[in-house]
């Protein structure tokens, strides 16, 4: 048996085992309990409500693989941004190479790595029903989150903007009718501080409720800049506010108005991880490259400035059992970055640069604005030909306009040269979508969904240069523009079967679609002026969702196989010896695997959670672009940023104390196997397997409305990389916040 056949056999066997386990749990669930009902209720796992199907429904009932993370749990764990949230979701990973502009979320090993404004993300981010069109917008601080849902696999039939790999659905807390508020503070080693406060209540009882939340966070960083006058880098400062007003003018109408504003300044750096050149080692001194190096020698520290803001209005109207929804939104994202493309210095540092290792300084601005409108109707259960049918359908429109300026200054020992590019993209996306469920029998349901999409895209690009020929990292002057329009479709077919009162299984086929793209970036060339073809996917998934022992145990399993065609990927090339990237239709890739989400409540005091994912994402047929400088022998290789196995384990033990107090002891462990960060499979870009242990001890009073906790992060003091970037003669590392052990204290008071 070949290695490939062994893998497929293992996957199919595991999927079958999972379905058998679900059936066994369904049988176990019908066994009468032998304990009093009151104890059963106290020990049961709380029901989780999600909106993954655009209706409020139990997580256990929706025929979609969904991971759910509770907002309060994230706050207590100091996971306050998307890059740390994915630590609790094994099927998801996060990649950030520079600033927020260069960030990507991956689901099941699939994501789009590109800074181009002319490409849409593979994983769509939706916040309170509003799609964020650019990936960089999603790197927000989590101000007042009720929960985060990660929908795995193509989701275009129900979400207004198609997502060929998945959806990150973020839901904020609704205002309470009762007046109240809270304040919480956190402090962690490294002088990381976070303060939040909020108030909410009724402005007009029964009609108007409102809430306002504000937050401030500050962290110097965990990398030392040893340059004269330098300080800590790799930190951040964030401040923002979010206001929400819910209006209920009558029993059939709800209106939600939301405004948010967030300003974030950060100083992300990459440290020298490895060097293979004596010249580079000499230029780097006194910094020494190494796997745990947390020092840089930069004369100008990097700075990323982001301002995210938006307004949205959602109107829900119910009539004759139908629910009509309108979501109108406008958002702005301004991004400015001052970064270095070299580990040994920037444009002002000429003493250490050489012709082999020039210093580069990048200055870029992004001005992005989007307007969106979604109209949706959810039907009641109606009779069609003797079958009960319900459906959700809608129309969607998104207009996005981007304007960017990017300048690169390259310094050698003898010269200073530069290039500047002014470019932008305008896109209009139209869609009609819907999905329905047909009851074939009492325990059998059919799922049918479809979506039509039209994308209209145009770009402009103009670059100037101080040289007539290419020099390190800068192409000669050029100017171009173009436009394209494409229609596409996606859909979903499936069956769902109830195995018993507390278990069901489903099987679905989904077609995903991601629109055309333009590779618009600083070093754009005439060969990049043609539009990239849309990316399509065909996904097959089987799953089981079950609970047993009076909801003391829930087990959700999914097995999937997805094939992508015209995969839009970043291709690494060289310009006068400097590594640059450009987007291409890379050909065919695929991903397959098994996922498990398990929750257990063996006693009222113990809560156990496990999330596991085996994901095999690989390149099937790589299309090498013409005149490529790099080798393209990649068929059969693994896709970057996709470890084969990830696990997240969490345990909490609650101890009731006198006087209404409670002590909670919790610990979590996330583990992943080795990860390849380079599409071209460089052995220098592999992060070995590692695990991170976190723990906390908390004392709280439900009557007093307060809690205080001691939190420990990365207790085993395990250094690791979230990205490794291979350059000529050296490798750089992206250093995560929890690269070393640290502890902190948090406190919260509600009133």
What are these regions (language model features)?
Residues 246-250, 377, 388-390, 396-398, ...:
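Structural signature of Gram-negative outer-membrane beta-barrels, strongest in the C-terminal barrel
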Residues 176-178, 186, 191, 198-298, ...:
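Periplasmic-side early beta-strands and strand-to-turn transitions of outer-membrane beta-barrels
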